[in-house]
A protein has these predicted regions:
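Boundary at the C-terminal end of the N-terminal hydrophobic targeting segment
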Residues: 17-21
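Early extracytoplasmic/lumenal segment of secretory-pathway proteins
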Residues: 22-86
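Extracytoplasmic ligand-binding site segments that recognize negatively charged/polar headgroups
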Residues: 29, 33, 72-185
Length: 185
């Protein structure tokens, strides 16, 4: 519910910016029913029509970059802060997300002046109870996955996957580059 509250807050803050427009274009890479319900509430509250342009993150990002200043996107909503950071690094995001309401609702580690996190996702570890005991996983951390006992027993997404890049970025922030490099070996 907090995710929806924060997204509603962000949408309401944009309402004044969209006040001169009768509609807003949201490039949307998320696929959650609750988001659609929120957009409907936004339209009911403001009278501003929400046009959803749904697609995969990569395709939407490519379109935004190719269209540049002529992009029809008013908001881009995606599923990982790593994607926001990459878009920011390419210079495609505008600033201005500095309101007191955003600052009070969203911790500094989940926002910049160009993007705001609206949800957190747990990175969980699945296991086969036929091959791994609960005792083996007691106190498990991502760092613990580097233990040699797990060699040949793990399956993860490709290292180029944005979720893995974000995981590695969080490990670097928490443990430093050297420790994370050793972990990744």
């Amino acid at each position: 519910m907090k995710k929806i509250t924060i997204l509603a807050l962000i949408m309401s803050l944009f309402a004044s910016a969209f006040a001169i427009a009768s509609e807003v274009n949201i490039f949307n890479a998320r696929h959650y029913k609750a988001d659609g319900e929120l957009y409907a509430k936004f339209t009911n509250k403001t009278g501003i029509k929400v046009n959803l342009i749904n697609g995969k993150s990569g395709a939407l990002e490519k379109r935004i970059i190719e269209e540049g200043a002529d992009s029809s996107a008013d908001l881009y909503i995606t599923a990982d802060a790593g994607r926001c950071g990459a878009m920011d690094a390419k210079g495609t995001l505008q600033g201005g997300l500095t309101s007191a309401a955003i600052k009070s609702a969203v911790p500094a580690s989940f926002r910049t002046s160009k993007w705001v996190g609206i949800a957190k996702r747990a990175r969980i570890i699945y296991y086969s109870p036929e091959r791994v005991t609960g005792a083996e996983l007691s106190g498990m951390t991502y760092e613990g996955l580097a233990d040699p006992k797990w060699k040949g027993r793990l399956v993860i997404r490709k290292s180029s996957n944005i979720y893995n890049k974000s995981l590695v970025a969080s490990l670097i922030k928490n443990n430093g580059k050297a420790a994370t490099a050793a972990w990744a070996e």
